[in-house]
Design a protein with these regions (language model features):
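Alpha-helical membrane-protein architecture signal
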Residues: 2-5, 9, 72, 161
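Active-site alpha-helix of zinc metalloproteases
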Residues: 9-10, 175
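Specific transmembrane alpha-helix
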Residues: 10-28, 41-91, 107-112, 133-156, ...
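Alpha-helical transmembrane segments of multi-pass integral membrane proteins
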Residues: 70, 74, 78-79, 100-211
Length: 211
């Protein structure tokens, strides 16, 4: 990928999921209602073993970036979707307890930011580190989204539902697309490089140029 756009590999993962979603939804539809959540959870757990498969790729191709490796992330969203139409149970009660659900998100985030999930730089992770990083990413995403979709669904969030936040959310995708290109310009401007400090300056300039 072109320098400054290396994050775009994730788009192929996302688009692949969207293309497969009708088939996945149909397969879930064929299951008994009570079997759907266990089946989706089982697929999520099984996907963490993707790196154990004897897949040989060309140099520079990382099969840990292929869609099946991130099935747990998409499974988290599918589980939340199932729970939105399920009778009130422990997921709903957990989502309505901010201390517990945000505590789970915080702990998972701290684990994903620790050496257990790999070094801070862009060195390829080991299989164990990849499993920790990916699984904790799924937990963080599910924990942050659960209160929004399971606690008073259909009611606009008093903070995230206001026009300013909705607009920023709409713009955020553009920032995702361009933030690395902005970083490529910002680092020479401030005379620093990745993981070497000047966080505030780099953040401000990247945000301005990214938008």
């Amino acid at each position: 990928l072109t320098a400054g756009l290396t994050q775009m590999w994730s788009l192929s993962v996302e688009v692949s999921f969207y293309l497969a979603l009708p088939l996945l939804a149909f397969l879930a539809y064929l299951l008994p209602v009570r079997a759907r959540v266990p089946a989706i959870a089982a697929v999520a757990v099984a996907s963490l073993g993707w790196g154990l498969l004897p897949i040989h790729t060309a140099e520079g191709v990382n099969f840990l970036n292929w869609p099946p490796a991130y099935a747990s992330w998409f499974a988290a969203g599918m589980l939340l979707a199932e729970w939105t139409v399920s009778p009130v149970g422990w997921p709903h009660r957990l989502a309505r307890n901010p201390w517990q659900i945000y505590g789970i998100a915080l702990v998972a985030y701290l684990i994903s930011a620790s050496p257990l999930a790999g070094p801070k730089n862009l060195v390829p992770a080991t299989l164990g580190q990849f499993v920790v990083r990916t699984s904790m990413g799924a937990v963080v995403a599910a924990a942050l989204l659960a209160p929004l979709v399971l606690d008073r669904p259909g009611t606009p969030h008093r903070i995230l539902g206001n026009p300013v936040m909705v607009t920023l959310g709409r713009w955020s995708y553009g920032l995702f697309v361009w933030h690395l290109a902005a970083l490529v310009m910002v680092f020479p401007m401030v005379g620093t490089f990745m993981f070497n400090g000047d966080l505030i300056v780099v953040f401000v300039l990247t945000t301005v140029l990214g938008f």
